[in-house]
Structures are given as C-alpha cells and as structure tokens.
C-alpha cells in the first residue's frame, strides 16, 4: 500500500456555512481545534462522531464552481430529507442509474443511494 485516504477536501466560497450544512446532512460535527485563519478565512473540518466516515475539510476559494465535479461523494440517505435541508436535485434515479444526483448549496454534486450499496 502506497497510501490511504486521510480525508476529503471541498472547495467553498463560505467554508464555515458549507461545513455546517454537511454536518446537518451527515450527522457529523465540527472538528474542534482544526480551524485556522488563512488570509482571514476559516479553514476547518468536520468528522463522523462514530469515527466511521472520513474527515471532510473545507478549503476557501475565491471563485464559484463552474464545471461538473471530477470527483464526488456517494452517500446513503433520504433524498427528500436532504432536499429539505437545501440540496438541489440534479438528476433523478433511473433503473440504469439507481441513485440520485444532488448538489449542495454551493453546487458541488454528490450522489445519494437510498438502499443497499448499488456499486457492489
């Protein structure tokens, strides 16, 4: 093994607000002691309180997302509940693609599966 995943990093215009949103979706909590000042911006992470999921970092960037993500997060969850929290529906589930594509409040796409892992 040459390496392992240490965490996931998301670019964000409002990194604290986006971190709080993802906490509400995933049941994560803000990681205390990880906030840093970086040119006046908050740089921090969120973590799974059960220590089962990866830590997610939020990196301040000056520009909005303009193209489709080259990489995305897949989660198991309740699509309606995530939409009610402020996600946007990008693509419906179909028999060929049994997951939904949603976007977070800053437009970052992610997939939601509602049942068993569809990729195994």
Describe the role of every protein-language-model region.
Residues 42:
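Active-site segment of metal-dependent pyrophosphate-handling enzymes
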Residues 1-34, 45-93, 103-120:
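Glyoxalase I/VOC metalloenzyme domain signal
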Residues 95-97:
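Short, small/polar residue-rich loop motifs at catalytic or cofactor-binding pockets
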